[in-house]
Regions:
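Short helix- or helix-capping micro-motifs
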Residues: 1, 92-103, 122, 126, ...
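Short acidic/glycine- and proline-prone juxtamembrane loop motifs at membrane-interface regions
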Residues: 109-117
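Membrane-interface transmembrane helices that cradle and orient dolichyl/undecaprenyl
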Residues: 83, 124-142, 168-170
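Transmembrane-helix signature of polytopic, membrane-embedded enzymes
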Residues: 75-102, 118-119, 135-138
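Loop-to-helix entry region of an early transmembrane alpha helix in multi-pass inner-membrane enzymes
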Residues: 43, 47, 57-76
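Extracytosolic helix-loop segments that constitute the early lumenal/periplasmic catalytic or substrate-binding loops
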Residues: 18-38, 43-51, 55
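Membrane-interface alpha helices of multi-pass inner-membrane proteins
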Residues: 138-155, 160-167
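Transmembrane signal-anchor helices characteristic of membrane glycosylation enzymes that use polyprenol
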Residues: 1-17
Length: 171
């Protein structure tokens, strides 16, 4: 994990990531989206880049450091889902393979807002599975919140919310 993370920090930002970082910086400077700057992406993209800059400063590697942190968290959720679906070896194998696959995909995949949305969706799916297994309103509420966070990066992923609700009603 450490080697993959360090290698990921050396990848240059993609052109999209340069633009998103600039917009995140503008947010930190007090500019207002859609008035002071405009892009076709939703505000979650800029907000996460602003958070990366706030945490790691204005550096070429700031977004990759923050993205790899998000990726590491989502990898834990995915490993547990793999364990539930296919056993403990699947969970352990995913933790070994995921960083190599993610970093090896290069900057046109890793760190893109599609992948960030996917990281939120993996966590949402984990909470959804827990909601189906256990009682309480916290589990589905967390799943819905994470789907909302994913939608702020990639709005089309919102189709999953009604599908997961239908699946819960079916059980």
């Amino acid at each position: 994990w450490l080697v993959a993370g360090l290698l990921y920090l050396t990848l240059p930002p993609s052109p999209d990531q340069f633009m998103h970082a600039y917009m995140g910086w503008r947010l930190l400077e007090g500019d207002i989206p859609y008035r002071d700057f405009f892009d076709t992406n939703w505000p979650g993209v800029w907000a996460l880049h602003a958070l990366a800059i706030a945490l790691f400063g204005v550096n070429l590697w700031s977004w990759h450091a923050f993205d790899f942190l998000l990726f590491g968290i989502s990898a834990l959720f995915l490993a547990d889902l793999a364990r539930l679906a296919a056993g403990p070896n699947a969970g352990r194998s995913s933790l070994i393979l995921l960083p190599v696959i993610y970093v090896g995909a290069g900057y046109w995949l890793a760190g893109q807002h599609d992948m960030t949305a996917g990281q939120f969706l993996v966590a949402a799916l984990w909470f959804h599975v827990r909601a189906c297994q256990r009682s309480g309103v916290g589990w589905p509420l967390a799943a819905g919140t994470l789907i909302g966070a994913a939608m702020l990066n990639k709005p089309t992923v919102g189709i999953l919310l009604p599908l997961l609700l239908l699946q819960m009603l079916w059980l």
